[in-house]
């Protein structure tokens, strides 16, 4: 089926048995890529062995090649699945460590600390005592003698041979005689003929009369309950007198706030009756203008009344006509500014 050697070249060499003469390689290449040709017998003719008289070299193997080969035979599953020193492979598992005994460790450390402390105490006791630091003393007392030293140097009145008589413990330190004791009265049992001292008293009648006059005392719990009920009654009376039926102060404040907000919204909204290009005159300015117009009207009327009735000159007639015209204008302005809303044209 194959017609001659293949012309396709690639990384995988073709089968050398198809065309042995064409695909023959040197011994070095055969040992490195295809294995030893003499061992694999890929080239069947014996005449090919004489072509290269040099014996082929053994394949080069790295130092870890045997380990890799053994690992491939056994598999790597046991190595990957070693859990806590327990191997799943055929190899022997390592020895497990015994759990640490913390109690023994703590006792050992405590004994060591105690031993060290005892050694320090022993060394401190054997060491020489340190000299005491002298207390500070003012230089002005250098020439003053010690009173204790002076008392010790004075000779005592008693000789050294005579023993000193000192008070001993639990000895009497007062006078030699004990203090006189008041004799206690002896109780004598009354005889059958003895009478009770004093007049006879009827204690039963006395106790009954005292019990009637004594006030009745209640228990502590009943007194506390009465005080609590009285406080509740006073609180209810105060509530009925001051708060019941009255609107709370916070509701009144909230009502005023709502009213001011509504007025502000109403003022901020444009008036539908206002013509375009106009603005509403403020209320205080409208009232001031109206008062000035009323004063002007009263002044013009006074001037008109003071005119002479029989004056028919041209000047008098023109002055009367001027006053009438001003009065008409003032009356028209009074009618306009007497309205609740006055719109003024804005300056363009």
Swiss-Prot record:
Cross-referenced InterPro entries: Enkurin_dom, Enkurin_domain-protein
Main location: cytoplasm
Residues with the Phosphoserine modification: 93, 138
Recorded GO MF terms: alpha-tubulin binding; microtubule binding
Keyword Phosphoprotein: yes
Subcellular location: Cytoplasm, Cytoskeleton, Microtubule organizing center, Centrosome; Cytoplasm, Cytoskeleton, Microtubule organizing center, Centrosome, Centriole; Cytoplasm, Cytoskeleton, Cilium basal body; Cell projection, Cilium
A GO biological process held by the record: motile cilium assembly
Intrachain S-S bonds: none
Keywords recorded for this protein, A-Z: Cell projection, Cilium biogenesis/degradation, Cytoplasm, Cytoskeleton, Microtubule, Phosphoprotein
GO cellular component, as recorded: centriole; centrosome; ciliary basal body; cytoplasmic microtubule; spindle pole
Entry superkingdom: Eukaryota
Biased composition (Basic and acidic residues): 95-127, 139-148
Disordered: annotated segments: 1-65, 84-195, 262-282
Domain Enkurin span(s) in chain numbering: 253-345
Pfam family, one: Enkurin
UniProt keyword Transmembrane present: no
Described purpose of this protein according to its UniProt entry: Microtubule-binding protein which regulates microtubule organization and stability. Promotes the stability of astral microtubules and facilitates the proper orientation of the mitotic spindle. This allows the oriented division of basal keratinocytes and contributes to epidermal stratification. Required for the assembly of both primary and motile cilia. Destabilizes the interaction between CCP110 and CEP97 by competing with CEP97 for binding to CCP110 which promotes the removal of CCP110 and CEP97 from the mother centriole and allows the initiation of ciliogenesis.
PANTHER family listed in its UniProt record: ENKURIN DOMAIN-CONTAINING PROTEIN 1, ENKURIN-RELATED
Quaternary organization: Interacts with alpha-tubulin. Interacts (via central region) with CCP110 (via N-terminal region); competes with CEP97 for binding to CCP110.
Stated name of the protein: Enkurin domain-containing protein 1
Organism: Bos taurus
């Amino acid at each position: 089926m194959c017609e001659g050697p293949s012309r396709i070249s690639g990384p995988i060499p073709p089968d050398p048995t198809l065309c042995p003469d064409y695909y023959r390689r040197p011994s070095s290449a055969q040992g490195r890529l295809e294995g030893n040709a003499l061992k694999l017998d890929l080239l069947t003719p014996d005449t090919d062995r004489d072509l290269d008289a040099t014996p082929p070299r053994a394949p080069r193997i790295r130092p870890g090649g045997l380990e890799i080969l053994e690992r491939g035979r056994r598999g790597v599953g046991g190595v990957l699945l070693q859990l806590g020193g327990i191997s799943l492979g055929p190899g022997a598992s390592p020895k497990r460590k015994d759990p640490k005994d913390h109690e023994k460790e703590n006792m050992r450390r405590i004994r060591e600390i105690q031993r060290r402390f005892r050694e320090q105490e022993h060394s401190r006791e054997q060491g020489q005592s340190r000299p005491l630091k002298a207390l500070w003393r003012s230089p002005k007392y250098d020439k003053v003698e010690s009173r204790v030293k002076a008392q010790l140097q004075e000779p005592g009145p008693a000789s050294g041979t005579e023993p000193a008589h000192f008070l001993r413990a639990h000895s009497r330190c007062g006078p030699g005689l004990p203090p006189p004791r008041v004799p206690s009265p002896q109780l004598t049992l009354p005889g059958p003929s003895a009478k009770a001292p004093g007049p006879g008293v009827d204690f039963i009648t006395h106790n009954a009369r005292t019990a009637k006059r004594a006030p009745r005392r209640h228990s502590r719990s009943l007194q506390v309950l009465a005080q609590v009920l009285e406080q509740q009654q006073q609180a209810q009376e105060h509530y009925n007198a001051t708060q019941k039926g009255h609107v709370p102060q916070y509701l009144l404040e909230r009502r005023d706030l709502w009213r001011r907000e509504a007025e502000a919204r109403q003022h901020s909204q444009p008036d539908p009756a206002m013509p375009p290009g106009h603005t509403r005159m403020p209320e205080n300015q409208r009232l001031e203008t109206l008062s000035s117009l009323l004063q002007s009207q009263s002044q013009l009327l006074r001037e008109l009344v003071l005119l002479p009735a029989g004056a028919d000159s041209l000047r008098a007639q023109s002055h009367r006509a001027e006053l009438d015209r001003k009065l008409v204008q003032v009356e028209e302005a009074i009618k306009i500014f007497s309205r609740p809303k006055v719109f003024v044209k804005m300056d363009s």
